[in-house]
Amino acid sequence: MAAASATSTDFVRFALDEGVLRFGSFKVKSGRTSPYFFNAGLFNSGASVGRLAQFYAQALVDSGIAFDMLFGPAYKGIPLATATAVALAGHPAMQGRDVPFAFNRKEAKDHGEGGTLVGAPLQGRVVIIDDVITAGTSVRESVEIIRAAGAEPAAVLIALDRQERAGPDDALSPHSAVQDVAKTYGMPVVSIASLADILALLQGDAQFAGNREAVLAYRGKYGVV
């Protein structure tokens, strides 16, 4: 499930301007050599994270998904959930609603409040917020944490859907990691933008048009139908 096209296009341009989205030749986590690279960790200033959170908030509002709170899986999801909650608090569609959020620690704390969870108690319908889905490990762990607390995972909200098939080259799945997550947990995965949005920008922008053939070839080999 992608966000509105105007928002998606704006986000791709924003990612390029911030150096988060780059073109070239990159060895990615899956072991593949990709003609583009998306590193959300480079949204690393107050202004860039603030604007990023506005994109997350808008994508969630546009999705129409009913939710009660946000959850950010450690570590990248922590600032994303926090900033998105702030952005939602100021979003006109929320009509003044104050959305709670929580996140987990990788290591349990044995003093103070203790445990692995920080923030609001997990309850109701919870949206998991992360940057991308590669293998789905973070989502699986988040779902287990949310269900263990008696709450319901409502959706996953990510920045970019690479729209590529999961698995090694000699045993490619017909589905992407995003599709597998949606099917396994029976909940939607909402992305601010996708590979299709990147290709749309490459087609319409002379500055980056030279990268389009390489990205198309990559999609032809690994892209989901």
Curated annotation (Swiss-Prot):
Reported cofactor(s): Mg(2+)
Gene3D superfamilies: 3.40.50.2020
GO cellular component terms listed in the entry, alphabetical order: cytoplasm
Positions with a binding annotation for 5-phospho-alpha-D-ribose 1-diphosphate: 29, 75-76, 105-106, 109, 111, 130-138
PROSITE patterns, per the entry: PUR_PYR_PR_TRANSFER
Coiled-coil parts of chain: none
Catalytic activity: orotidine 5'-phosphate + diphosphate = orotate + 5-phospho-alpha-D-ribose 1-diphosphate
The entry's keywords: Glycosyltransferase, Magnesium, Pyrimidine biosynthesis, Transferase
Pathway: Pyrimidine metabolism; UMP biosynthesis via de novo pathway; UMP from orotate: step 1/2
Entry's EC annotation: 2.4.2.10
Its biological purpose: Catalyzes the transfer of a ribosyl phosphate group from 5-phosphoribose 1-diphosphate to orotate, leading to the formation of orotidine monophosphate (OMP).
Protein name (Swiss-Prot/TrEMBL): Orotate phosphoribosyltransferase
Organism the protein comes from: Bordetella petrii (strain ATCC BAA-461 / DSM 12804 / CCUG 43448)
Species classification: Bacteria, Pseudomonadati, Pseudomonadota, Betaproteobacteria, Burkholderiales
Gene name of the encoded protein: pyrE
